[in-house]
Amino acid sequence: MNWPALKERINLYEKLMRLDKPIGILLLLWPTLWALWLSALGRPNWIVVWIFILGTVLMRSAGCVINDYADRDFDKHVERTKERPLTAGKVTTKEALALFAGLSLLSFLLVVFLGNTLVIWLSLPAVFLAASYPFTKRFFAIPQAYLGVAFGFGIPMAYAAHLGEVPAEAWWLLLANVFWAVAYDTEYAMVDRDDDLKIGIKTSAITFGRFDVAAVMLCYGVTLAIIGGIGYSLNRGPAFYAGLAVATCIMGVHYTWIRGRERMPCFKAFLHNNWVGLSIFVGIVVDFLVSGRNLW
């Protein structure tokens, strides 16, 4: 294979892994970083941090590949997805499965490098969740909740990496992530609702129906309440809650965008959730930095 052909192949694989659309990586990364900082009380092991960041990129990429494999017959009927490499026939199903297996193997090797038995065991359901999520859209009324577990499974793994155990706090944080994922992915599903109804797949936007906007805002509220409760249980300071306050304001802006149920504003709100995750993370980091200097 000559260089131009190889370059074109690499570009197709990059698109299949959605490396050109990093929002999914960020939505997966922020909860993992929350957990790494909270579990280490603001002093995470930097080797662990970098391994989790790289693992997040690899597993999100693997998730995109298997998602396109599962949805290849549906995507051709959706305007936004009909040109994806697998659906368009530019990448074969064998190539996609091989790429998914390779990315999953690399992620597992990263976990093995940590040398933590509990993290290794937790990586097994993490891979299962990533691989099985795309198929839940065929029978589960709110597959976004399943996505929240899959996207958030780095949380218990992060606690296990730092503490050697997974305390209740980690599971509460995972639950918060489930509600956050239902919120932002419902916004995403609102974009494709008409197409999804035609092809017969299930989404939260369809299930919630005319209560979709209210459901999004309720899920946002539960997310903030759970994270706030975690902060209270850990005796966190003003900066922690300031991060939540900023996130609350951002969520309020999202309401103004999604209440009209128009495609582009809903998609804009989905993308904007990056700033929700970042705001919460900055609040956590700053709070630990300030409390470490006894400034509160």
UniProtKB/Swiss-Prot annotation:
It is found in: Cell inner membrane. Keywords: Cell inner membrane, Cell membrane, Magnesium, Membrane, Transferase, Transmembrane, Transmembrane helix, Ubiquinone biosynthesis. It catalyses: all-trans-octaprenyl diphosphate + 4-hydroxybenzoate = 4-hydroxy-3-(all-trans-octaprenyl)benzoate + diphosphate. One of its GO terms (cellular component) is plasma membrane. PROSITE patterns: UBIA (PS00943). The chain crosses the membrane at residues 22-42, 46-66, 99-121, 139-159, 163-183, 211-231, 238-258, 270-290. It is a multi-pass membrane protein. One of its GO terms (molecular function) is 4-hydroxybenzoate polyprenyltransferase activity. It holds the Pfam family UbiA. CDD domains: PT_UbiA_COQ2. Its EC number is 2.5.1.39. Belongs to the UbiA prenyltransferase family. HAMAP family: UbiA. This is 4-hydroxybenzoate octaprenyltransferase. The gene is ubiA.
